[in-house]
Amino acid sequence: MFQINDNFQKLPGSYLFSTIAKKVAAYQEANPDKEIIRLGIGDVTQPLAPAIIDALHKAVDEMGNAATFHGYAPDLGYEFLRKAISDNDYKARGCDISADEIFVSDGAKSDSANIQELFSANSRIAVTDPVYPVYVDSNVMAGRTGTYDAQTETWSNVIYMPSTADNGFVPELPKEVPDMIYLCLPNNPTGTTLKKEQLQVWVDYANKNGSVIIFDAAYEAYISEADVPHSIYECNGAKTCAIELRSFSKNAGFTGVRLGFTVVPKELKCGDVSLHAMWARRHGTKFNGAPYIVQRAGEAVYSDAGKAQLKDQVAYYMNNAKTIKTGLAEAGFTVYGGVNAPYIWLKTPDQMTSWEFFDYLLENANVVGTPGSGFGPSGEGYFRLTAFGNYENTVKALERIKAL
């Protein structure tokens, strides 16, 4: 008889946001007259920018003409998009990242789950705690995390780096040397960041110890402070120790369009083996390229009109973040984040657990957020609210919470 990958059986429960969706659906079915405001999952609400819509329309018209029709895309991405990314996201910031070091995909989530395939099954990972759950779950599926302790909600072969109020949500360098270090900056879920000199310490640590940093920069467009790096490649030596993940979902509203990319520098090697070559081989085998229409939309993100329109869109969401953070602070909540990231990380009141506060908000304010414990054990007693709602609903949700 056939056998299954037993590692999938090790995953506790369902994926965090799937669990939330089921709980909300059950409540809505039982209370159809209630208006629920969703500030949980980080899905955008504003429409695609006009420059992007124009690019989509033009590309669709091209697909309707035999002379300009495009079939399978190049598996690593169209050159026009890879060059636009290289010029605008990297060379403009002084980072020497060439177009052929950029691998276009259908989003950062799949890349963040798939990148672990480059590493051996006995590699140890280190994650900040709390952390985006995909990093750990994908390594569980690969059989890399050891055994699960339900009481502590930790894995025996995972190195946890607590990010709490006590350390300003800035983790310490791990004492046990990991093979892979996952860093998400600006951070999801805490909304905190590192300054360049702080990030340089991590790069130096990785190079010294032979570790690879998986750097998730999905929220870099929301950085407002000048001394916070947008890319890990702004640090000296990062090209020999870091892989960077990027998304078009949060900076350009592509959650329903799907586009992202991963940077794997040619200098990143394990002995004589190039991780760049490995990822190119993996990408070519398992991915058939993002659609032409979508990649043309991605190119429009870097047009003058696209940049201006998306700057306004980011400002819209960050105004939501400011509104939530200020309002909750006035109501007596302890709040973090919301400055360089579109997330508010708040302490749950009255010693409620994260899920108790989730239920309390849903039932009494009809507002959905994300329980902090879903991001790891150090997230217990915290709660995440997103600034990606529309402004009117954000204000309404805040009024409901303050009235409790």
Curated annotation (Swiss-Prot):
InterPro entries xref list: Aminotransferase_I/II_large, DapL/ALD1, PyrdxlP-dep_Trfase, PyrdxlP-dep_Trfase_major, PyrdxlP-dep_Trfase_small
Pathway: Amino-acid biosynthesis; L-lysine biosynthesis via DAP pathway; LL-2,6-diaminopimelate from (S)-tetrahydrodipicolinate (aminotransferase route): step 1/1
Sorted UniProt keywords: Aminotransferase, Pyridoxal phosphate, Transferase
Residues with N6-(pyridoxal phosphate)lysine modification: 250
EC top class named in words: transferase
EC number per UniProt: 2.6.1.83
NCBIfam families documented for this protein: DAPAT_plant
PANTHER family for this protein: AMINOTRANSFERASE
Name of protein: LL-diaminopimelate aminotransferase
